[in-house]
Amino acid sequence: YVDSTQGWRPTDASTAAAITETNIFISATVSGACNTLTTCGDYKIATFTGPGTFCVSAAGGPVAVADYLVLAGGGGGGPDHGGAGGAGGFRESYCATTSGSYTASPLATPTSLPVSITAYPITTGSGGTGGSATPDCGARGNSSIFSSITSTGGGGIKSPNISMTGGSGASGVGQGGPGVGGAGNTPPVSPPQGNNGGNSQATANYAGGGGGGAGGVGGVGGAPQRTGGAGGAGTTTSINGTPTVRASGGSGGGSSPGTSTPATPGGGGRGGAGATQSGNGTDNTGGG
């Protein structure tokens, strides 16, 4: 590469003709409210926080691939001393020859996604609504989609005693007896998109487990007594140029005299206890 005026020139032939026949990198635009296309060094980062389109206008060169982070909406937790929602599915790719040098999450696959000249519709999954009072339930998070990559919404609470599966599973519920956390990485993909929700202990503890996170299972509810389990750990990636923790599970709800359980870094909401309300997950993080 010479400069912005002369562009790319061959070095293995006795000619100084500029290369014009082949697009070396892909060119693309984004559409949709609040969606952005920014520059980070020699690379472009397309960020979607709402529905839109990733429109590729040139992809004929040797680098017709893109790396991605597809993050689904977290699940909603249950009411009272209920279980917590699981984090939304977390799926990432990273290949240095595609996207340069940055630190990806431990969950990243080394296989970038091939792209062609077309418009790719983007689906951004919203978080599930939490239950406000028994028998209200926490809704499953919504899935996010880019091309062939689907991240599944986090598990919610199906009934006072049943936890849903999802990208990361919802936790066991602390009402009516011990509860088993929902399964994460459902449907299964490799690398896994999430982890199981935490279990809850016997009825006398009245505390839900923590929702599963991208980086770990949810904590057990009722240990210590009447205190909700911690949300499962999120995971860190620098795909946007800044190390950021995303996709932690929500913390489970407890009951008096237990204490509220703090939010786990990565967007998951805190767990309430007694007069302390539970907290919502943070927008655009995939937290439960």
Can you annotate each of these PLM segments?
Residues 1-288:
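Glycine-biased low-complexity/repetitive sequence motifs
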